Structures are given as structure tokens and as C-alpha cells.
Swiss-Prot record:
PANTHER family: ATP-DEPENDENT CLP PROTEASE PROTEOLYTIC SUBUNIT (PTHR10381:SF70). Its EC number is 3.4.21.92. It comes from the Bacteria. Pfam families: CLP_protease (PF00574). GO terms for molecular function: ATP-dependent peptidase activity; ATPase binding; serine-type endopeptidase activity. This is ATP-dependent Clp protease proteolytic subunit 2. The lineage of its organism: Bacteria, Pseudomonadati, Spirochaetota, Spirochaetia, Spirochaetales. It comes from Treponema pallidum (strain Nichols). SUPFAM superfamilies: ClpP/crotonase. Disulfide bonds: none annotated. Fourteen ClpP subunits assemble into 2 heptameric rings which stack back to back to give a disk-like structure with a central cavity, resembling the structure of eukaryotic proteasomes.
Length: 199
């Protein structure tokens, strides 16, 4: 009896969550919240394709609040944002860190916004690699490639010199919303929905 009640409660919760996301999609908004993983990326990519199929002219608004996560999953979202014909606006809120910044930068520079109290973190990729020395060496080379690629992307999208980006990301580099605006991660600070472009 208790098991049935638990399953019913879970089903009701999942149904409510599904309704919420359906309503959210109807307003052409996507919420990327939490650690970026393969599963999260798959869900975000699916929403992007659905919204593109409904209209290629009406913009998509993606709200990003993420401590980072899987860089490859972040690139999957990044590439699809660039792939779809629909204009995409990214809005940073809360904490936008690491791979979260990668997703934020997928929008064109004048289509990147930040809420007033958002914070940003850029740094070099992290590794928890363990194993034999040869595997660690291979992994270290791949990490360095990823680091160089991310630094080049940040420099290209912000206009900050590659040397400065490399220096900044050598350690955790924190920015508040105003500093992120000055750095070029975002193009506008906003406080209300009316501040977002409609077309």
C-alpha cells in the first residue's frame, strides 16, 4: 500500500513537472539550471530543436544558472545554439561558471544578457583523472587542448586578448555582473523582462 502511494506521488510530481516545462516551452523559454551533464544537454538540445520547428523567426530565451560540468556536454549545447536558424538569447542568472559560461557565449555578443546579481567564473578545465602514468599523461594532453580551445573561444567572443584570457583562467577568475559586462561575457545588464528584445 505504501509502495503504491509512493509511486502515485512520484507520478503526480513528474506529471506536474512535465506540465511546467510544457508551459515554459510555449513561451519559448528554456531553463538551464544545475550541473551540465550529458542528460541535461540532451534535454536542452531537444527543446532547441522543438522550438526551431515551431518557428525560425521567433527568438528563444535561454536562462543559464549553472556551476559548470561536462565540457563536452557544454559544447553540444553550444553547437546546437549556433546550428539552429532561430535567434537565441542567453541570460545569465545566479551563478554562471565554467561550462556554463561556454553555453552563455553561444549566443551572439549582442544577444547575451546578465541579471543584476549574477556572478561568473572562468577557469581552466578540471580533472579528477586517476590511473596509470601513461593514461594520466594522455589525459593531461587532452586537457591542455581543451584549455587552449576554451581560451581561444573566450578571447574571440569577448574581444579580450588571448594572452590575458590565458592568464585569467590560470586560476579561478570571478566576475560580478558589471565586471562580466566590462569583460565582454555579456552585452547588457537587465533587471526586468521588458529589457529583453522581443524580436
Amino acid at each position: 500500500m505504501r509502495c503504491d502511494a509512493t509511486q502515485e506521488k512520484r507520478a503526480h510530481s513528474e506529471s506536474g513537472e512535465s506540465v511546467f516545462f510544457q508551459k515554459f516551452l510555449e513561451t519559448r523559454q528554456i531553463l538551464l539550471s544545475g550541473e551540465i551533464s550529458k542528460d541535461l544537454a540532451e534535454g536542452i538540445v531537444r527543446q532547441l530543436f522543438v522550438l526551431e520547428s515551431l518557428s525560425v523567426s521567433k527568438p528563444i530565451y535561454m536562462y543559464v544558472d549553472s556551476p559548470g560540468g561536462d565540457v563536452d556536454a557544454g559544447y553540444a549545447i553550444f553547437d546546437v545554439i549556433r546550428f539552429v536558424k532561430t535567434p537565441v538569447y542567453t541570460i545569465g542568472m545566479g551563478l554562471v561558471a565554467s561550462a556554463g559560461v561556454l553555453v552563455l557565449l553561444a549566443a551572439k555578443k549582442d544577444c547575451r544578457f546578465g541579471l543584476r546579481n549574477s556572478r561568473y567564473l572562468i577557469h581552466q578545465p578540471l580533472s579528477g583523472m586517476r590511473g596509470v602514468a601513461t593514461d594520466i599523461e594522455i589525459h593531461a594532453r587532452e586537457l591542455e587542448k581543451t584549455r587552449s580551445k576554451l581560451n581561444a573561444l573566450i578571447a574571440s567572443e569577448t574581444g579580450v586578448s588571448l594572452d590575458k584570457v590565458a592568464q585569467d583562467t590560470n586560476r579561478d577568475y570571478w566576475l560580478d555582473a558589471s565586471q562580466a559586462l566590462e569583460y565582454g561575457l555579456i552585452s547588457n545588464l537587465i533587471e526586468k523582462r521588458a529589457d529583453l528584445p522581443k524580436k
